[in-house]
UniProtKB/Swiss-Prot annotation:
Catalytic activity: ATP + H2O + 4 H(+)(in) = ADP + phosphate + 5 H(+)(out)
One Gene Ontology cellular component annotation held by this UniProt entry: plasma membrane-derived thylakoid membrane
GO MF assignments: ADP binding; ATP binding; proton-transporting ATP synthase activity, rotational mechanism
EC numbers, comma separated: 7.1.2.2
Cellular compartments annotated: Cellular thylakoid membrane
Protein's name in the database: ATP synthase subunit alpha
Residues reported to bind ATP: 170-177
Family: Belongs to the ATPase alpha/beta chains family.
Coiled-coil ranges (or none): none
Job of this protein: Produces ATP from ADP in the presence of a proton gradient across the membrane. The alpha chain is a regulatory subunit.
Amino acid sequence: MVSIRPDEISAILKQQIEDYDKSVSVSNVGTVLQVGDGIARVYGLDKVMAGELVVFEDGTEGLALNLEDDNVGVVLMGEGYGIQEGSTVKATGKIASVPVGEAMLGRVVNPLGQPMDGKGEIASTDVRLIENPAPGIIQRKSVHEPMQTGITAIDAMIPIGRGQRELIIGDRQTGKTAIAIDTIINQKSEDVVCVYVAIGQKAASVAQVTEVLRERGALDYTVIVAAGASEAASLQYLAPYTGAAIAEHFMYQGKATLVIYDDLTKQAQAYRQMSLLLRRPPGREAYPGDVFYCHSRLLERAAKLSDAMGKGSMTALPIIETQAGDVSAYIPTNVISITDGQVFLSSDLFNSGLRPAINVGISVSRVGGAAQTKAIKKIAGTLKLELAQFDELAAFSQFASDLDAATQAQLGRGKRLRELLKQAQFSPLLLAEQVAIVYAGTKGLLDELPVEKVTEFVRELRDYLKTSKPEFINAIQTEKVMSESSEAILKDAIKQVVSGLLVAA
């Protein structure tokens, strides 16, 4: 028979009392009243914050957007097939945040910062809130450094500066994304961190962009944030803010950054869908009243920081898709009024063979002129005016039978300028090459050359300068100014190439 010893029992009880965990966990919990269309109505969650992350029983995350008297409207960040009426919801006490830092470079992530490229977890210790206030007036400096796109038409006539917001606007299939990708590729030697945000695009399109950047060595300094067409509306809505947060981290470290939002039309549509399902009152074109604020608070985060803040910059290139060239619709007019200028792409010009299809007449850069390099500013001053006059004359000359010599000469020069500004995709030019091409056109050095030979002239001149006159390219690239000696070298080079082409003809 086993003897019971009271001292042993008391020792065991004492040990168990000592090991007892007294910690109490308090959770803010609610119950699902209704779920459907990516929206859940939740009862409870009394102390939830606006924009707070909540977690459902099946692990789906949500964002508390509507805080009402008797329920909370939550948008789901996933399919949420496992959520049922009566399921519990737990508030996390956290606002949506994203990992940031060097570890993000070269990666493809979703709007919550989770990897989508199959390269494993992102080893980043830094985290930043997705929504952040924009820098204040005192923290900013006026735009004064150029952001070279490598596209002659833009760098010469619609220059973009670091810290600027320049809208790229046009119908579908007019080359909007191509301009953005060219700009990223052109930053290879500029030490600029790039963020490409794909909103509501086909997965195949995002894969194609990723491959193009990888082939050209641009993925090493680029982060891709993708919220595809099949993703929840909440993720498409959040994607641009995630891109801004990733770029902000580098901006506040004193680096230059470039963010492409491709495109904000789809983000506005996702926000409209969420707002209507949350029963918010619709306004013009059924968009909610705060859709302007949705875009303005995003684009105001782009800035050129003051010296005291570390001299960093964030340049934003938002893209907007128009319907049949209508720039007077609600979202296009909103974004035009927020940004510092726009590059307007025309489907008529695109179909006529002018690529990039930039309509120079209504494209403008409101602050970039201050950032333009002296070398190209000096020679491109008349370019925009000459092209505008050419467009006017070309329309007039269709009805006029006999034109005087001066008008014919002006039309001839306009045609040559148009040809000079044609540029193949994924082939950005050096500043020195742009200077040489624009100089040849505006100074009338190509007036004798047949129009069909202009494209060949551009190719020959670039090769000639690289092989025979590297001192010209080095001088322009380093000094950013056209000296008298450089001008003499360039004039001689242009004459050599033109005479060679005329002899061949």
